[in-house]
Amino acid sequence: ANTGRKAADLAPVGKSEEDVSPARQLAIECLSAVTDATVILEELEDYQGPTDVDGVLRPYNLLLVKVFDGVQHATVMQRVHPDRALRQAASDCERRYLDLRIRTRLSRPLYELINRVDVSSADPKTQRFVELTLRDFQLAGVHQDEAIRARCRSMQTSALLRCRGRGGGTPALGCDCRTPTI
C-alpha cells in the first residue's frame, strides 16, 4: 500500500532536508521513488478492474518510465559525481531500481494481466508494445514455475552485478552484458 511518504518524511528526526548530506538526501529520494514505483507494480499485480489500455497499460508504462528514469539518474550520478559517498548512494539506488526491474519482469500476475488486455482494436504501436512486452516477460522466464523464476532472478541479479563490476554500465543503458534466460 502507498504510504504517501515523501523524501522529507524519511529525513532523520530533528533534521531538516538542508541538514542532510547530499548522499543521504539521494538515498532518501531514491527510497521514496522506488517505493512509489513498487506501489504501482503491486497495484497492477492485484488489479481487478477492466483489462484495457487505460486500466493496465498506462500504469504499466508509468512504472517502466519511473524505473528507467531512476536507473538513468542513479547511473549518471554514480559515474560522474565527485563525492564518493554520493556515488555509493547512487550505486545503491541503481541496484534498488534494477532489482525492481527484475521483479517486474518475473511477475506472473503482471504478465497474465497484460496478456489479457485486448489490443485488437488498438493502434499498431500499442499492439506492438504489448507484443514486445509479453516477449520480454517470457525471455526473462516469467512462464516458468516459482523455483525456476527464483533461479532466473538470482542469475539476472548476478549478471547485472558482473556487468556493473566490469564498468559495462547497466543493461538499461545499453550494457553489452546479456541477462541469462532459462
Spans of features found by a protein language model:
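Zn2+-dependent metallopeptidase catalytic domains
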Residues: 1-182
